[in-house]
C-alpha cells in the first residue's frame, strides 16, 4: 500500500476527530471575545470589532458538521465525500483567513475607537445613570482611574459637585479610608483606564488570532491530504487502499 495514502488517510481521520474538539474550542474563543466586548461595550463605538468573533463561531458550527462528513468520507474512501470534504475545508480555511485579516485590521483601530468614546462616557458620569455603572465597573475591574489618569476627573461635573473628589471606584482595593481626594494618591489607582482597556482588548484579539492561525494551518495540511488521496486513487484504481 502507498505510504502517501496511508499517511494521508491517517491525517484526515485525525483531522476529522480534531474538528470536533476544535469546533468546541473555537466556539469558546468566539464567545470569550464577545463576552469581553460586551463587558466594556459602553466604551467601544465600533461594533464591527465583533466581526472576527462572529466568523469564528460560524466556523465552529460548520466544523462540528464536517468532522462527521470527514470521518465517513475517509473510512468509505468516497471520492464524492472527499471532494465535498475538500471544498468545505477550503471554505473554512478562507473564512479563517478572513477572520485573521479582520482581527489585524480592528486590532489597529482599538485605540482610536477608545479615544473617541471613553471621554464622552466619563463626562456623563453622574452617580446614577448607565454610564456611571459602566465606568465604576471598568475602574474597579481594571484597577484604573480616569481616561489617561486620575486627574482627568477634574474636567468632569462630578468632580466639581462632589467636593473635588473622584468616584470610590478609583480607590485601591481594601482601602477603606479612601475618600476620593486627589491629595491622597497613595490610596488611589493612578493608571488611566484607556491604556489598560486597550491592553485587555489587544490581548483578547491576539489570543483569538493565534487560535485562528493554528487551526488554519491544520486545515492547510488537511487539504494537502485530501489531494494526495484523490490523486493516488486515480492512478491506482485497481489497487485497494487497504490490503
Swiss-Prot record:
Which parts of the chain does the record assign to the membrane side Lumenal?
A: 31-49, 106-208
Record-annotated membrane-spanning stretches: 10-30, 50-70, 85-105, 209-229
Give the way it sits in the membrane.
Answer: Multi-pass membrane protein
Q: Which tissues is it found in, per the record?
A: Strongly expressed in melanophores and xanthophores. Also detected in eye, brain, heart, skin, fin, testis and ovary.
Q: Per the record, what is one GO cellular component?
A: plasma membrane
Q: Which residues are glycosylated?
A: 149, 163, 174
Q: Which UniProt keywords apply?
A: Developmental protein, Endoplasmic reticulum, Glycoprotein, Golgi apparatus, Membrane, Transmembrane, Transmembrane helix
Compartment(s) where it occurs, according to its Swiss-Prot or TrEMBL record: Golgi apparatus membrane; Endoplasmic reticulum membrane
Keyword Transcription, does the record have it? Answer: no
The record describes its post-translational modification as: N-glycosylated.
One biological process term from GO is: pigmentation
What InterPro entries does the annotation carry?
Tetraspanin/Peripherin (IPR018499), Tetraspanin_animals (IPR000301), Tetraspanin_EC2_sf (IPR008952)
Query: By its UniProt entry, which Pfam families does this protein fall under?
Result: Tetraspanin
Asked if Glycoprotein is a keyword of the record, the answer is: yes
Give ranges for the Cytoplasmic compartment: 1-9, 71-84, 230-243
> PANTHER family recorded for this chain?
TETRASPANIN, TETRASPANIN-36
Family listed: Belongs to the tetraspanin (TM4SF) family.
| Known role | Plays a role in migration and segregation of pigment cells (melanophores and xanthophores). Contributes to pigment stripe patterning in the epidermis.
Q: What is this protein called?
A: Tetraspanin-36
